[in-house]
Structures are given as C-alpha cells and as structure tokens.
C-alpha cells in the first residue's frame, strides 16, 4: 500500500489530468445525453437516432406506396420539380399586355433592376429554403433561347456588393423601413441605365422584388432608408425604382417595350402599371410571386409564348394601401409602444389587435363598397381605389362561354328554395371555348353568390366566392365543359349578435333575393358576370346543426366579439370605419390583465378545473411501471384503420404509464416520440410551406431531411386557381415523404408542417407568402386538395396556424391579444381549417401563438374542442406553434383544452404537482390517443406489423461522443501505464502487471461505475 501511495504521488500530473477529463466528459455526457431538451435539440441539428431492423420482414407491411414511377429520392425530386415548374406556368399572372408579349422568336432583351441577381424565391424564416442549385432568371431566359445583355448583367453584378438588398430581418424585428436593394441612377454612366442597352432592344425586363418572412411584418414607413421617402412604405416603388422606370420609358430611351416583373409573395401598390405614369412604353407586367427552386423556368416559356399565362390574383390589388380598413389595426401601427396595453399609464407585457373591420376584408370590402357607392351615384369610387380585383388575370388566348345547365341535385333548379334544399348540390355546367386563332390556353371561371342585405342587420359582403374551376389546355377552337358546385348552406351568414332580432344566433339565410354568378373575377361577379341566376327562399332559414357531425352549432366567443364596440358596417362606411388605437384605447383595467393568466383559465388549488367543461371525476388507470414489449399485448399496428372510437384504443392506452404519455406529449420537436413497447415509431415531421425542410439542421451529411423539392410560395400555388394542381402538390409531397431518409435509416417523413391557411388580412403581414390568398373559402378549397393527396400517401398535414394568426409583430409577446367578432371568425378565419377537416380529412392541426380574446389559441377549449372537435368532428392531434413561452403556452392548459402535442424539444405537461389530478390524467390520455391515432393512420407505420422488431442505434453525434470518451479513456490508460512504469526500479520487475493494474484499477472503477 505504501508503494502504491508513493507511485500515485509520483504521478500527480496523470492523476489530475485523468480526474479532470473524467469530470469534463461526465459533464458533457450528462448535459448532451441525459437532458432531454439538449439531447432532442442535438438530434434535430445533427441527426437523430437510427432505426435498425432486428427481426422480421417489413416488406410484408407496406400500407402506403409511392407512385409506380417513383423508386428513389431522385425520382421523387424530379417529379416534384416538374410539378413546381407547372405551378409557375399556371400561376404567373399576366397583369398587362399592350401587344408586348409574347416576344418574337430569338428576341434580345436587357434585364434591369439590381434584384435580378438576388431574386426572392421564398420568404425567410423556419420554412425557407435555399435556391443555390435552382433556376434563376437568366437560366430561364437561356432555356427559352432568349438572348440577354451580358454586359448589363455583369455591371449589375458589380453593383450588388454596394447597393444590394441586405439580409432579411430576424424574428421579432419591428422595422422602420427596409431597403428594396435597387441601385440609384448615379450608379450608371451619365445617370442613364438605358444607354447600356446595346443591341438588346426587343424588351427591357425590369425586376422589382419584395421579401417577407416569419417573425416580422413589412414596414409601413421607409424612415431613414436611402432611396426612399420617409412617408412611403415598403410595398410601393421606392425612388430608385421610379427613377429607373422613368429612364427606361423616357422619350430618349431606345426601348419601346418595357415589361415589369413583380417578384413578391404579397401584393404591392401597382397603380403605376395602369395609370399612365410611365407613358405608353410600359406595355407589359407579370406577377411571378416567389417561384421556389425551379418555378422561374416557366417565365422564359411565357415570354416566348410556348406557354400561355393562366394565373389569377389571389388578392385585391389596391391603389392606396392606407385605405385598407384592416390596416388601421395591424402590427405596431407606427406607434412607439405599438398596441401595448397599459394599466394606470404603465406599460404591460401584453399587446393587442382589434379586427374592427369585421367581415370586410379584401374583396369583401372593396366589392361591397364599390357596389354601394355605385348605388349612390359614385361609380368612380371603385376604379379610384382598386387596380386589379381578386381573381384577375390576362391570357394570350380569348374565350367564350355558354351555360349548359344549372341543377339542384340533378333536377332543374327552382326560383324558390326551401329548408329541405339546404344541403342539396347546386351544379352549374359551363362550356368554355378557346376562340383564339393562335394560342393554346387555359381559362379560369369563378362562382360567386350575393345575399340580400337589410340595413342595420346582419353584415354581408356583396359577393362571396363559392367555387372555381380551371379548364384543361384548349387548342384554338377547342371547347370543354367545366363544373362549379355549391350548396345553399354555403351562402349563409353568421349572425353572432342576433342583428336581425329574430331570437336566433348562428348561421342564417334571410328572406330576399339571392344570386349566383359566374365571372372572371370578383368585380365582374356583380359588375359584368358571364352568367347570373337569381332565386329566393320560401322562409328564413336558421341553421343550428353541423352538416357533417349533426352536432349543435352555437356561439362560442361572445366575450371576444363584445370587446370591440363598433365594427365596420356597410350601413355607414364612414361612421364605422376602423380607427387606429390611441393611448386611451390602450389603457385597460388590471382585471383584464389578470384574466390572461393560466390560473384564471384553468383555476388553481381548490378551484382547479371546477366548473370547467373539461372536468371529469373519473379516469381510467394507467400503468405504474412501464410494461415490457412482451407484457404490452396490444401494439399500435393493431389499430391501423380502426375508428377513433374503437374500444381497442382503451386497451392500448391502458398499457401506458403517465410518464410515457407526458414524454410523448412534451417532446414534439419536428417529430413524435417512440414508445417501443407498443411498437410506436419515432416519426419525422418537417416544416413547411416551401416543402420538407428543417431550419435547425447544420450538417447536410447527417441531416435526415435533405434533397427535397423547393416549392413555390403558397400565394403562387393559389394563383394557379387549379385544384388538380394543388392535388399534385400533395401527391408530390407524399412521394417525397414516403422515400424519406433514403441514405439513412429509410424512415419516412410522415408529418408535414403545412399547408398554412391563414389569410392575407393586410398586404404587410410578413408571412403572406406562406398563405394562399385573402379569402378563407379559396384557401380551404386549395389546401383540401393538397391534404387529400398527401393523406393518400400516408402523410399527415399539420394545417396551420389555428386561428386568427394574421400578423407577426408581437406574435409571441405573451400571446398577441386578438379581438374579433364571431361572424368574421366563422365566415373567414375558421373556414380554411373547417374545409381541410371536413373535405381534406386532415388528422393534424397546428395552433397559433396568439390569444383569441384573453385565452391562448393553443389552450382554448372553445376553439380546440368546442368548434374543432365537437362541431366539425376533427379526429387527430393538435400541436402548438414553437413553444419557448411556457408562461402562457402552458402544456397543462393545452391538454385540458384539447391540444395534444408540444412543439418543443422538451416541455412536458405535469405528471405530479399542483395541476395533476384525475382531470389532468384524463387529458393526458386524450392527447396521447390523438397522437397515436394520427400516427397509426400514416406511412410512419410502413414496415410495422406482427413479428417485426426494431431498435434505435445511436445517432452519429452520439457515436462521436462515445468515441471521444473511448479515445480519452484509452489514452489515459496508456499514459498511466507508462507513467507508472517509471516508478518501478529495475529490481522490482516493473512489468509486474498485478501491481500496475492495481494502480490503474482506481481509475477504471470510477469510469466503469460511471458508465
């Protein structure tokens, strides 16, 4: 023993180093491998654990399959890119064409605008993607054999570093302006860009780009921005762009054909295209949205006439954005404190937004007001305010129309309808003929309704979109039949406050004249319809029962509706027009602030859950100790295809512990967790509206989500007005999801954080590029097609963001407090979600950051259970938005309200403590049921069945940590061996392994004990 002490004293350097390394590696290992939040974060960033087959033949259990021609990831990407290029072909909108397009064969063009080398392919944020390997403007021109001015291109390339658009704003930014990235005229010789045209004079293409992104809204001021007026806003031309257009369209310019390319996922002020500001040389304009990775290839085809444009706008393009009613209550309203609630003059942590405009959003305002102003003799009002109506789009071809039939459940429709006709299908068949002698083309027709309005009673838009259809490609002289379908129920209005005093609140159809019109756009629906059919009702219809579930429909948000005292009314536009909140409007009582707390909603102590709609007095028991694989007899694959209410679900859920349930619910970070004893696999559920992506991934080689299609923005997909193409998007996503992680463990991408279906409440919302349009019905129709197709491939789609998530500013500052009346909720903001549930069949929803009234949307029982689950019959899981704010996005409140999954690396609902009781345990069980039901009916179960056994092998980053541990351990042992060796003299036979081993054993015991 004395000798050992001597040896150890002689080797203090080795001992101290070894002890230090053990301490360091222990800390690293505990932090990275034992703290779920960090472990799950590293899994997301560097790659997840790998699924390894242990026994059985998974090929026996393939429940979902790719298309026959899709065999690999490259096949899936090729098909998806073809779909995306078609989105460009059918979505780019021809806004103006004074015989400027198509260009002549072998045309020579000059491209102007500094953003030509920094175009916007998608918005920024968690679902953005890179276009490094995509198709840019010049490759599109090359592919179309259009020659372009390379000298001019190179000149712009040199200007980029000095004048180009800066990096996108980041999450939470409130920006007082943002540079467009355009160069001033002073950057050119003699301040004259047109002088650089050379022989490339067939057209001047002018690129105008605007970005958008998650976490910030677009600025309504350009304060302190070079090249812009401080009183201008981001979505109009800045001075540099105006100067460029003036130069190119001046009498001294060599160009006679200037064509503007609008590269923006949201609408812009485009009055300059039509009002003659730039004379008669500005002859053409095309809106191209954000085209994704290869969508821009369609532009060259459209410029040459190989493809006839057939896109239509999904927003009303307004001449002056500051006339938009909803803009009076949006973002920070250019106030220093924004819409910040104050108590006794002191700021709080809460911000609010008032939807004072009610139902009058987008075309519902401009078409209704245009109609009422015309009745008053002010017919010029509409053109003074609107540049392009919703649904507008030009074509190279011309079309004629002939109505073939209009029927009610296949019978001739009567001029008077009854309650028994409420859900019968009204079908209109229209013959469309291409009367062009030259151009092939596709045409869009749109179906609108108009309901009787009674002064001072239920608010009604003069026109409402019901349906739309797009023809196949028609050759010159070719004709086809398109069908448009609706029901009487879809023409109902929601009377949230018994405005017509008939003692009924809910959906109603008033007596009076109703009209159905087929038109090219929302304005033509009442001003110049292709076809119009009038009918009346035998009596007022009050609708109390949901047509799908048979459940009662009734007000759920009276407290929210009543907060705003005056909503915009067509009975008095001027007197009820929204007003920007003043400091007085921001002052509230402390009682209101206290009502925002979690405790005020779910209760606490003796009041916890008492009198709440989610309260239960009994709940089934859970296991105390986790069952082994053999003890858990019911597996998740036994429930594939079973209804949500099948009794076997209880048998499955009875096998789980509370800990298993809370871990599943609390770790939904782009996945759902594995539960091995019931054969529930871990899933991969990536973002987003641009296609499968994961913004947290840092190493491409270990990423589980890679080599996927970069799809066009949803506003461009919407502009196709093509349901069949929206279905193809879902099918392409489905094929990509089924191939999944081809180079890794072959795990599918079974979930998708998309489509996003919020509306364009204002043009300034940062995420408008992620949403289809300003109209809820339109969004619902398009998204439902994508959802159906993806579901057919086993992909569950998290439809987001439910609900009233229409601005980014202060979105998660303890939950933006959103006030709105229930009519607008049910006629506009809820509709796309309702469609995707009832028509699309989605089994996943993402809730939103904001509050609806005082209650967080993701923990709002009336929203998630009352409307979504009970009224609409939704079955599946509801995930939160990314949850870094547990102070209000509380998982205990979430599960009580009907939420299921927390989008965070690790934030579990309670499994003990102040909020844990029988009601809570029942809520955990319901949430687990929701998640398991969704996953059971998805491609995540491919390869799972009787006799199949998988294990999870450590991810590569974990293997790296294990390897470092091993290398360090071996190094210390070798060092220790030779260090101790020196402590023996030659007579003591240093090679006596027993003595050396005794010295090393102290270290080894510690290491072995640790591992």
Predicted regions and their residues:
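Glycoside hydrolase catalytic-domain context in secreted enzymes
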Residues: 1-503, 507-518, 522-523, 554-1011
């Amino acid at each position: 023993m004395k000798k050992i002490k001597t040896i150890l004293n002689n080797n203090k350097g080795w001992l101290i180093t070894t002890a230090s390394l053990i301490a360091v590696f222990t800390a690293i290992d505990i932090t990275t491998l034992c703290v779920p939040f960090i472990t799950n974060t590293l899994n997301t960033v560097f790659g997840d654990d790998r699924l390894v087959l242990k026994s059985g033949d998974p090929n026996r259990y393939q429940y979902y399959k790719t298309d026959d021609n899709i065999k690999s990831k490259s096949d899936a990407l090729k098909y998806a890119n073809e779909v995306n290029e078609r989105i460009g072909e059918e979505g780019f909108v021809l806004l103006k064409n004074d015989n400027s397009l198509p260009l002549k064969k072998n045309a020579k063009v000059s491209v102007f605008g500094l953003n030509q080398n920094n175009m916007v392919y998608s918005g920024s944020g968690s679902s953005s993607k890179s276009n490094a390997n995509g198709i840019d403007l010049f490759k599109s021109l090359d592919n179309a054999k259009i020659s372009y001015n390379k000298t001019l291109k190179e000149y712009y390339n040199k200007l980029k570093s000095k004048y180009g658009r800066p990096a996108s704003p980041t999450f939470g930014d409130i920006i007082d302006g943002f540079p467009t990235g355009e160069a001033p005229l002073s950057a050119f010789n003699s301040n004259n860009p047109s002088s650089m045209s050379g022989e490339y004079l067939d057209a001047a293409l002018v690129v105008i780009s605007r970005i958008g992104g998650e976490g910030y809204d677009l600025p309504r001021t350009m304060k302190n921005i070079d090249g812009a007026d401080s009183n201008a806003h981001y979505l109009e031309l800045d001075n540099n762009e105006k100067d460029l257009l003036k130069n190119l369209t001046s009498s001294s310019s060599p160009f006679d054909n200037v064509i503007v390319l609008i590269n923006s996922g949201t609408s812009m002020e485009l009055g300059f295209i039509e009002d003659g500001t730039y004379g008669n040389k500005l002859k053409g304009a095309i809106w191209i949205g954000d085209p994704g990775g290869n969508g821009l290839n369609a532009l060259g085809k459209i410029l040459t006439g190989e493809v006839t444009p057939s896109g239509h706008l999904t927003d009303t393009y307004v001449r002056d954005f500051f006339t938009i009613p909803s803009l009076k209550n949006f973002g920070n309203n250019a106030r220093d404190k924004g819409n910040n609630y104050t108590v006794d003059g002191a700021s709080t942590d809460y911000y609010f937004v008032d939807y004072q405009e009610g139902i009058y959003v987008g075309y519902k305002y401009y078409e209704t007001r245009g109609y009422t102003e015309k009745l008053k003799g002010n017919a010029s009002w509409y053109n003074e305010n609107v540049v392009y109506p919703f649904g507008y789009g030009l074509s190279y071809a011309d079309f004629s129309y002939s109505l073939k039939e209009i029927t009610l459940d296949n019978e001739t429709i009567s001029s008077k309808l009854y309650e028994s006709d409420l859900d019968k299908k009204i079908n209109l068949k229209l013959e469309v003929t291409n009367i062009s002698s030259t151009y092939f083309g596709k045409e869009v027709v749109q179906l609108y309704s108009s309901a009787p309005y009674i002064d001072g009673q239920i608010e009604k838009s003069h026109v409402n979109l019901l349906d739309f259809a797009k023809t196949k490609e028609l050759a010159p002289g070719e004709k086809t039949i398109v069908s448009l379908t609706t029901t009487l129920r879809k023409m109902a209005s929601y009377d949230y406050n018994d405005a017509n005093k008939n003692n009924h609140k809910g959906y109603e159809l008033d007596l009076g004249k109703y009209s159905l019109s087929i038109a090219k756009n929302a304005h033509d629906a009442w001003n110049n319809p292709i076809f119009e059919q009038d009918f009346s009702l035998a009596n007022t219809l009050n609708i109390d029962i949901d047509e799908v579930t048979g459940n009662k429909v009734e007000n759920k948000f009276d407290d929210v509706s009543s907060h705003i005292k005056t909503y915009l009314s067509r009975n008095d536009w001027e007197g009820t027009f929204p007003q920007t909140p003043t400091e007085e409007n921001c002052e509230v009582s402390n009682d209101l602030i206290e009502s925002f707390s979690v405790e005020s909603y779910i209760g606490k102590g003796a009041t916890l859950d008492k009198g709440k709609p989610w309260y239960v007095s009994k709940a089934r028991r859970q296991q105390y100790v986790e069952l082994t694989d053999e003890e858990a007899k019911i597996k998740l694959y036994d429930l594939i295809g079973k209804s949500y209410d099948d009794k076997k679900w209880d048998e499955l859920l009875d096998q789980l512990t509370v800990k298993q349930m809370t871990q599943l619910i609390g770790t939904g970070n782009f996945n759902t967790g594995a539960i091995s004893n019931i054969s529930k696999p871990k899933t991969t559920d990536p973002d987003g509206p641009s296609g499968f992506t994961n913004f947290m991934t840092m190493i491409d080689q270990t990423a589980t989500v890679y080599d996927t299609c970069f799809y066009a923005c949803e506003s461009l997909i919407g502009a196709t007005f093509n349901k069949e193409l929206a279905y193809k998007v879902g099918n392409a996503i489905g094929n990509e999801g089924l191939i999944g992680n081809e180079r890794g463990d072959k795990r599918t991408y079974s979930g998708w954080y998309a489509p996003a279906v919020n509306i364009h409440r204002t043009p300034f919302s940062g995420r408008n590029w992620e949403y289809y349009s300003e109209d809820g019905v339109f969004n619902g129709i398009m998204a439902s097609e994508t959802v159906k197709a993806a579901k057919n491939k086993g992909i569950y789609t998290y439809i987001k963001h439910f609900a009233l998530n229409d601005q980014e500013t202060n979105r998660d500052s303890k939950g933006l407090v959103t006030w709105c009346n229930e009519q607008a909720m049910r006629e506009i903001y809820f509709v796309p979600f309702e469609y995707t549930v009832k028509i699309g069949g989605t089994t996943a929803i993402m809730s939103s950051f904001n509050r609806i009234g005082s209650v967080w949307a993701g923990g709002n029982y009336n929203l998630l259970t009352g409307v979504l689950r009970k009224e609409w019959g939704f079955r599946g899981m509801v995930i939160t938005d990314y949850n870094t704010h547990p102070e209000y996005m509380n998982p205990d409140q979430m599960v009580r309200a009907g939420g299921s999954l927390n989008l965070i690396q690790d934030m579990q609902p309670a499994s003990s403590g102040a909020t844990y009781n029988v009601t809570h345990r029942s809520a955990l069980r319901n949430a687990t049921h929701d998640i398991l039901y969704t996953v059971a009916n998805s491609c995540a179960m491919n390869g799972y069945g009787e006799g199949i056994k998988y294990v999870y092998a450590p991810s590569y980053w974990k293997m790296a940590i294990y390897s470092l541990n091993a290398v360090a351990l071996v190094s210390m042992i070798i060092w220790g061996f030779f260090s101790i060796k020196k402590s023996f003299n030659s007579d003591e036979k240093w090679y006596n392994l027993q003595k050396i081993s005794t010295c090393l054993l102290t270290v080894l015991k510690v290491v072995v004990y640790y591992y």
